[in-house]
Amino acid sequence: MATYQEYKSRSNGNAYDIDGSFGAQCWDGYADYCKYLGLPYANCTNTGYARDIWEQRHENGILNYFDEVEVMQAGDVAIFMVVDGVTPYSHVAIFDSDAGGGYGWFLGQNQGGANGAYNLVKIPYSATYPTAFRPKSFKNAVTVTDNTGLNKGDYFIDVSAYQQADLTTTCQQAGTTKTIIKVSESIAWLSDRHQQQANTSDPIGYYHFGRFGGDSALAQREADLFLSNLPSKKVSYLVIDYEDSASADKQANTNAVIAFMDKIASAGYKPIYYSYKPFTLNNIDYQKIIAKYPNSIWIAGYPDYEVRTEPLWEFFPSMDGVRWWQFTSVGVAGGLDKNIVLLADDSSKMDIPKVDKPQELTFYQKLATNTKLDNSNVPYYEATLSTDYYVESKPNASSADKEFIKAGTRVRVYEKVNGWSRINHPESAQWVEDNYLVNATDM
């Protein structure tokens, strides 16, 4: 299904003259959008201006392909009335996102772009007709609702500056509008898109990537940066992402994390600790965290790098105090962190579905026995990275361009050669030294 975001990427800055008259007018932009979506377009047969699309909507056939809506989402077609100083001849454009203060961002032609080309402009909602038009093909797409409550079993995604500023398409692909958005890192870095990401999703929280190691004073400075740059949408949860830069002093690391969380709590938010289980066990006394902030753990642990839209419970990284589980980094093709809620906002009791772990999960040094079969009936067994690791292209290699895999990642082992294991595919160019692999059932 074609999406608005794809159309925007293709069209912004370009001009389209569909009827061959008067150059790239606003109607031509609307008609081109319809053609892109595979839909017929309505003509302006009364006044000759865009207002006819709305005023003749019951006669021109547009309602056969579009639904009338009162609350706009990205990709809806908006028709503007005759308003002096704003849209003096009426206008048609595509809603992009909320701009605040009674204005929206609209993608359209003949609104100031060179030679009438598509551009984004801020126009008051007061100039629009009471309803907009949403392509019926968008009917099953998720929409921003401002519902940020969390129930057990809900899904959410977490995003950073690696994702697009407009999360509409990302949320549609993931099947949820609920997000946790990266705001800051260390003491200087700020995302350039966290506000727009919040505007185009239903944020349940925001996160900061910590670099303070075991320095409690630095942790408090990082918390101050985070708190002073939050998006305007209100949330309950603020997260410290602590998965790197730990010091050798486990107690100092723990104190620093708690110092950060104390700052969050004193500002009126619910603090959450995010990391991977192996990193946490090696560097943090997490029992002290949950003693002060019960059920405040958001843990990451993946079975593999295949697309996963729902969790495989036999791979849950069991530990105390877990509220959310990031069960995959590939929630959609191309990569996207996806999470499941284990504890509702008002709950303190977590129930994990009981799954009998198969005997085949035991780690063996040979592939002769107790293996599993993949979809091609090729035997493999499963193991876990004991530390962050850069995989090699072949045994004993020293590649310049290496793929990074995080500690705690589960991998499939297909072949073993002289102390090296080929992982993830029987013909892959991914090799790990055996002494960095541990029994997956022990993690």
Curated annotation (Swiss-Prot):
Report the residue ranges that make up the SH3b domain in this protein: 380-441
Q: Which CDD domains match?
A: GH25_Cpl1-like (cd06415)
Q: Where is this site: Important for 1,4-N-acetylmuramidase activity?
A: 158, 185
Instruction: Tell me the domain of life.
Output: Viruses
A Pfam match is Glyco_hydro_25
E.C. designation(s): 3.4.22.-, 3.2.1.17
Q: What residues make up the catalytic site?
A: 26, 91
**Variation of activity with pH:** Optimum pH is 5.5-6.0.
MF terms from GO for this chain are:
lysozyme activity; peptidoglycan endopeptidase activity
Q: Which UniProt keywords apply?
A: Antimicrobial, Bacteriolytic enzyme, Glycosidase, Hydrolase, Multifunctional enzyme, Protease
Q: Where is the Peptidase C51 domain?
A: 1-131
Q: How is its activity regulated?
A: Ca++ enhances the activity of the enzyme.
> Reaction catalysed by this chain?
Hydrolysis of (1->4)-beta-linkages between N-acetylmuramic acid and N-acetyl-D-glucosamine residues in a peptidoglycan and between N-acetyl-D-glucosamine residues in chitodextrins
GO BP field: carbohydrate catabolic process; cell wall macromolecule catabolic process; defense response to bacterium; killing of cells of another organism; peptidoglycan catabolic process; proteolysis
Region ranges (Acm domain): 145-344
Entry's free-text remark on domains: A CHAP domain is present at the N-terminus and is associated with the endopeptidase activity. The CHAP domain is responsible for nearly all the cell lysis activity. An Acm glycosidase domain is located in the central part of the protein and is associated with the muramidase activity. The Acm domain seems to require the SH3b domain for activity.
Q: What does this protein do?
A: The endopeptidase activity cleaves the bacterial peptidoglycan between D-alanine and L-alanine. The N-acetyl-muramidase activity cleaves between N-acetylmuramic acid and N-acetylglucosamine bonds.
Q: So what family is this one in? A: Belongs to the glycosyl hydrolase 25 family.
| Protein name listed in UniProt | D-alanyl-L-alanine endopeptidase
| Organism of this sequence | Streptococcus phage B30 (Streptococcus agalactiae bacteriophage B30)
Taxonomic lineage of this organism? Viruses, Duplodnaviria, Heunggongvirae, Uroviricota, Caudoviricetes
